[in-house]
Amino acid sequence: MRIADYSVTKAVLDRHGFTFKKSFGQNFLTDTNILQKIVDTAEIDQNVNVIEIGPGIGALTEFLAENAAEVMAFEIDDRLVPILADTLRDFDNVQVVNQDILKADLQTQIKQFKNPDLPIKVVANLPYYITTPILMHLIESKIPFQEFVVMMQREVADRISAEPNTKAYGSLSIAVQYYMTAKVAFIVPRTVFVPAPNVDSAILKMVRRDQPLIEIKDEDFFFRVSRLSFVHRRKTLWNNLTSHFGKSEDIKTKLEKGLALADIKPSIRGEALSIQDFGKLADALKEVGL
């Protein structure tokens, strides 16, 4: 019997008197086929260390520990630590870290792996309410995570993996795809969780690029320009730019010069621009003094 089998999950929760906290976005997966599929998608083997976020009672952790060299699982809810010690007692390659992943010193933590030189993959069922902050925190860290295979709200997965000229495409798509490739691997129905969430989930596979997708002069400015271009999705790029930078004649002149330099029409909408287009735009606006 697996931890994820419904009868086992229920027995574990009952034995420990565990109640779910909405503030932690807790939904436990009870489908072993999906858990195996996650491990297969992540291509976990003995030559890989894994960081897991939000292990819950250890359903996914069990599958990871059977395949990986070592698993480091970050759990913010201290009520789950003794439960994990119980459910994962047969594994000597699992470290449970009772800490918020956003506050963890990951550079120090990964040195605690028995073999810290192995490639590191992130595999997790992320809480819906904090998916984006966790992802961006990990992506922007200086730790060379090889890839992420993470479960999240389907809508967020669609936004991250979206292409230009689609409804889902936006600044989040750009922020992630600048660093990583992103593809939805498969959909997970809401019915396989306890308690069941209100929406379906998706498994998103993200692989780190050897180099960022494009070369730009100022990354912070690039991300700022991409974000402001989607503040009002139905407005033109020109309207979003002037709303942010200002509408004085001097600013308008600089914006006109920058757009011309990047060969981008002011009447276009942000959703029509590729990441490469945003790179050219940011560099051009920087060049004209914005």
Swiss-Prot record:
Organism field: Streptococcus pyogenes serotype M5 (strain Manfredo)
GO terms under cellular component: cytosol
Gene: rsmA
Enzyme class: transferase
GO MF terms, alphabetically ordered: 16S rRNA (adenine(1518)-N(6)/adenine(1519)-N(6))-dimethyltransferase activity; RNA binding
Domain of life: Bacteria
Phylogenetic classification of the source organism: Bacteria, Bacillati, Bacillota, Bacilli, Lactobacillales
Chemical reaction(s) catalysed: adenosine(1518)/adenosine(1519) in 16S rRNA + 4 S-adenosyl-L-methionine = N(6)-dimethyladenosine(1518)/N(6)-dimethyladenosine(1519) in 16S rRNA + 4 S-adenosyl-L-homocysteine + 4 H(+)
Keywords per UniProt: Cytoplasm, Methyltransferase, RNA-binding, rRNA processing, S-adenosyl-L-methionine, Transferase
Binding site residues for S-adenosyl-L-methionine: 27, 29, 54, 75, 100, 125
Function of the molecule: Specifically dimethylates two adjacent adenosines (A1518 and A1519) in the loop of a conserved hairpin near the 3'-end of 16S rRNA in the 30S particle. May play a critical role in biogenesis of 30S subunits.
Protein name per Swiss-Prot or TrEMBL: Ribosomal RNA small subunit methyltransferase A
EC number: 2.1.1.182
Entry-linked Pfam families: RrnaAD
Keyword Chaperone appears in the UniProt entry: no
Bilayer-crossing regions: none
Family membership: Belongs to the class I-like SAM-binding methyltransferase superfamily. rRNA adenine N(6)-methyltransferase family. RsmA subfamily.
Record's subcellular location: Cytoplasm
Matching PANTHER family: DIMETHYLADENOSINE TRANSFERASE (PTHR11727), DIMETHYLADENOSINE TRANSFERASE-RELATED (PTHR11727:SF7)
